[in-house]
């Protein structure tokens, strides 16, 4: 039976409870347990890159990790992955800081990873590579003679050609991505954007069985919306409340609660959300003294200027809004720039009347799905969701809004706060069915099934494809 080899920027080793808490780790571990295999990635430590791989084995899974030098980590991770790809793929070209040295560092680390992984690969292994840190990774493996099936899943959006083509290395990245056998995206929009970028750069041909050929390389593309563990979240949210949370719930029983949580990031639309809440208070004064909006946004990449700026902006806006609309005994907006235990947040989701999830751009946004899963089906809250989150393609029974339109968001909040129980139950039931169907295990099983059906590459087949395709002439 073929093994599965998973490669990601960071791994979740079995002895690290913090890193293994997320839903992605659950999905990857489920796939690894089913097939047996290897999880390969950065250790999270700055150190000697020539040091032997650190390996841990539990049952049929081995975790293998490596160190990065300070320079390589800075150029590969901070400067290029998060300084170029992250803002560009989230449609923020104004925040892109492209430096040729960072691009070279990004390629160097992908090459280093390929050198370290190649000796561990067995002939019939299936490889599954994750996210924007590793766009050129398959290309590096192919250079080293690896012809195994290699799949790739992009967790963030893929931008349209107008955005992507602004990157100085757009052509190189596209050609490198074509070295994957299967490219998975969160939404059809992302998949289409990738193919549109290719069609503008080179000759893109399509076969009757759904294969694409570009740059002399053949690959498949598909949509795999990532999911969550709905039953685990339902259990966590329904359990007894800790004493402090029980006291808080009692104190807030007289008001309706709007709740949001995400890491502090410019893609999440937090300043626009604060402005929309202010518009709600301005245009719908009947809610004064009767609602409370709590925004939890723990610091993310706090050493980056763009993140420092947004934190300062939110702190200023929260103070201004509370100063303008607050009353003795009523503070309309609570902004908490700190981390909370995930299981505790699921309980908070359950007693919130409105879940407000309005990113400006998001690959999926699992918080929206977690909010749905955490609700009491007999008395659920209402989800207000950005139309630019990948989750909006599935959770169509949410109140979908344009996060750039503060009046639209304010009107949706007013509607959510006034929504009758029967409508809340109907909307929640429809969304919960989708969340349960497209859970994290369905996601990984669908991807692995399709990857296994790919015909492995061979030198003869690649030569035929190169003869059949050629770049577009200028």
From Swiss-Prot:
Can you provide one Gene Ontology molecular function annotated for this UniProt record?
A: alpha,alpha-trehalose-phosphate synthase (UDP-forming) activity
Protein known as: Trehalose-6-phosphate synthase
Return the InterPro entries for the record.
Glyco_trans_20, Trehalose_OtsA
Please report which protein family the annotation says this sequence is part of: Belongs to the glycosyltransferase 20 family.
Q: What is its EC number?
A: 2.4.1.15
Q: Which NCBIfam families match?
A: PRK10117.1 (NF007513), trehalose_OtsA (TIGR02400)
Describe the task this protein carries out: Probably involved in the osmoprotection via the biosynthesis of trehalose. Catalyzes the transfer of glucose from UDP-alpha-D-glucose (UDP-Glc) to D-glucose 6-phosphate (Glc-6-P) to form trehalose-6-phosphate. Acts with retention of the anomeric configuration of the UDP-sugar donor.
Write down the species: Cronobacter sakazakii (strain ATCC BAA-894) (Enterobacter sakazakii)
Q: Which residues bind UDP-alpha-D-glucose?
A: 22-23, 263, 268, 340, 366-370
Known partners and oligomeric status = Homotetramer.
Annotated positions for site Involved in alpha anomer selectivity: 86, 156
- Catalysed reactions, semicolon-separated: D-glucose 6-phosphate + UDP-alpha-D-glucose = alpha,alpha-trehalose 6-phosphate + UDP + H(+)
* Keywords from the named record: Glycosyltransferase, Transferase
Pathway(s) the chain acts in: Glycan biosynthesis; trehalose biosynthesis
* BP terms from Gene Ontology: trehalose biosynthetic process
């Amino acid at each position: 039976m073929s093994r599965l080899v998973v490669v990601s920027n960071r791994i979740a080793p079995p002895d690290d409870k913090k890193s293994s808490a997320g839903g992605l780790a659950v999905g990857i571990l489920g796939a690894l347990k089913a097939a047996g295999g290897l999880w390969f990635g950065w250790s999270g430590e700055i150190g000697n890159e020539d040091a032997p791989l650190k390996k841990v084995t539990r049952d049929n899974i081995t975790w293998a990790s490596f160190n990065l030098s300070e320079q390589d980590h800075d150029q590969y991770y901070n400067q290029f992955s998060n300084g170029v790809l992250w803002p560009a793929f989230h449609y923020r070209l104004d925040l892109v800081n492209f430096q040729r040295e960072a691009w070279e560092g990004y390629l160097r680390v992908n090459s280093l990873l390929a050198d370290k992984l190649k000796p561990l690969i067995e002939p019939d292994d299936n490889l599954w590579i994750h996210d924007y840190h590793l766009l050129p990774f398959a290309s590096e493996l192919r250079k080293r003679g690896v012809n195994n099936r290699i799949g790739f899943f992009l967790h963030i959006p893929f931008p349209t050609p107008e955005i992507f083509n602004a990157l100085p290395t757009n052509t190189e990245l596209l050609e490198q991505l074509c070295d994957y056998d299967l490219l998975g995206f969160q939404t059809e929009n992302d998949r289409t954007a990738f193919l549109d970028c290719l069609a503008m750069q080179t000759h893109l041909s399509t076969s009757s069985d759904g294969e694409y050929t570009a740059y002399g390389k053949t690959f498949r593309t598909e949509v795999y919306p990532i999911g969550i563990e709905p039953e685990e979240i339902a259990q966590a949210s329904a359990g007894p409340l800790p004493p402090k949370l029980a006291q808080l719930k009692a104190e807030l029983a007289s008001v309706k609660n709007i709740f949001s949580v995400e890491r502090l990031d410019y893609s999440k639309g937090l300043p626009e959300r604060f402005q929309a809440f202010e518009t709600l208070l301005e245009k719908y004064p009947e809610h004064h003294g009767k609602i409370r909006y709590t925004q939890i946004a723990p610091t993310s990449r706090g050493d980056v200027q763009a993140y420092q700026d947004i934190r300062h902006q939110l702190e200023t806006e929260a103070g201004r809004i509370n100063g303008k609309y607050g009353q003795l005994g009523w503070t309309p907006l609570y902004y908490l720039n700190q981390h909370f235990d995930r299981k505790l947040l699921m309980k908070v989701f359950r007693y919130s009347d409105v879940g407000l999830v309005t990113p400006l751009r998001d690959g999926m946004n699992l918080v929206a799905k977690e909010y749905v899963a955490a609700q009491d089906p007999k008395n659920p809250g209402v989800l207000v969701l950005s139309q630019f989150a990948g989750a909006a393609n599935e959770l169509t029974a949410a109140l979908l809004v344009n996060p750039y339109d503060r009046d639209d968001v304010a009107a949706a909040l007013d509607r959510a706060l006034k929504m009758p129980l029967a409508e809340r139950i109907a909307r929640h039931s429809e969304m919960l069915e989708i969340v349960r169907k497209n859970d994290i295990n369905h996601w990984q099983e669908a991807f692995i099934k399709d990857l296994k059906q790919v015909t492995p590459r061979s030198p003869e087949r690649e030569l035929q494809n190169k003869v059949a395709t050629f770049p577009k002439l200028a």
